[in-house]
Amino acid sequence: MASRNSPLNPSVHFDNFRNWLELEGEAERQRMESRRNRLTPAEAERSGSTLLNMVVTSHTTGLGGRYLLTLQKRHAPERLPWHRFRVGSPVSLSSEQDHRPLSGVVSARRRDHIEVALNKWPEGDSFRVDMTPDEVTRKRQREAMDAAEHATGRLAKLRDLLLYHADPDFGEPPEPEGAEHLDDSQRQAVAFALSAQDLAIIHGPPGTGKTTTVVEVIRQAVANGQRVLACAPSNTAVDNLLERLIATGARAVRLGHPARVLEVVRSHTLDALVEQHDARPVIQDMLKEADQLERRSRRYTRARPAPGQKHQQRKEARELRRHARMLEQHAINQLLADAEVICATVSFDFRVLDESTFDLLVIDEACQSVEPGCWIPLRHVQRVVLAGDHCQLPPTILSGEAAQQGLDVSLMQRLVEHFGDTVTRQLTVQYRMHEQIMQFSSDHFYDG
């Protein structure tokens, strides 16, 4: 039986998390700064967190005008040294000529090169690439908590429920159609989640089919004409969810940097779908013409150009780029409007959705996310279903002080401890675990 807590003051609650995020950010900065200060450039490279003397060997342009740079070693182009860079790693790119680093993301890695996505073209001939802290995610988390604290309308009602000022509501549980492949506990969980007017939680030990159950909740919601926002803390978990949704025939679009998406589902990313859109050839022609005009405006000629000619060329290039962005945005809006399910990590920048709202938010592996992360997608939804295992390891926290004070307590764990069976359904049949391990897990963590 859960023990009910007193209602939480929104200002105090969110201020606590703001302070803990500061502690976490400082812990991450100190760890990277310590590593950088105590290591020479050569040692930093040997540690795997830095690549030196990198040169741009080719580049392309991606969605939103991002530059995708291919970088190789200047003096050893056949192979990169061992390094920790992974697809999706946030990085900084700096040169000897311009010491102001540019922020980017690793979009691909091969034996002889890495590809980095940047919003600006870097100045210089030779570059240093360093791993960097992920400050962008913490900024989004703070903004989401600010919005929740001062919210009106549906977000305010969800906030009040999640901070214990109200109780959850449920309708009559429907009988899920076409769910014969599920066991009894999974079907009950699906029906329970679909009956929730604001909050439901699905939990269970490893191997009980939580993601299978979540996918069925989404499939049933879509069949009822609802739009769904499907999230998880990690890119791998989102891609796993997306792959299963695609198999059900759902029209799903994956938001997020293609560099962070598994290749098997990359064709469903917004970037890939825009590339295939009817407007793409026109957009590419506009950008190509803009590039040519800008090159002409910078080109030296012996003959004196007509007065204002170069200025006019740059102006025309800007206009072409503006029209290309408008066409691209129209394609994006169309693709998002046609989607039944939008998939993304909880920390994604959902501004691309503008004022769009969804009937249902599902967060898989919710216990692996710090609470501030969950408030980011909550801004766009009517109700939420959380799925995960609150008896497993909590989110990874670098700051011992922040973890001790409460940053390592997930939103799902907090709600399970407060509301208990009122909002939860447990999956009970384990499909993939050694029998003795399964019994130990059941006895020690799930009350038998």
Indicate residue ranges for each PLM-predicted region:
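A helicase ATPase "motif cassette" and its flanking acidic/Ser/Thr-rich regulatory loops
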Residues: 1-86
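Pre-ATPase regulatory/linker segments immediately N-terminal to the P-loop/RecA-like helicase/translocase core
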Residues: 3-16, 78-191, 247, 265-288, ...
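Conserved P-loop NTPase motor core of helicases/translocases
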Residues: 173-174, 219, 227, 231, ...
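Pre-Walker A (Motif I) flank of P-loop NTPase domains
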Residues: 185, 196-202, 225-226, 340, ...
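The Walker A (P-loop) glycine that initiates the GxxxxGKT/S ATP-binding motif of P-loop NTPases
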Residues: 204, 257, 365
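Conserved glycine(s) of the Walker
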Residues: 209
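Hydrophobic positions on the alpha1 helix immediately C-terminal to the Walker A/P-loop
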Residues: 213, 217, 237
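Conserved helicase motor core of SF1/SF2 NTP-dependent helicases
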Residues: 224-226, 234, 248, 347-448
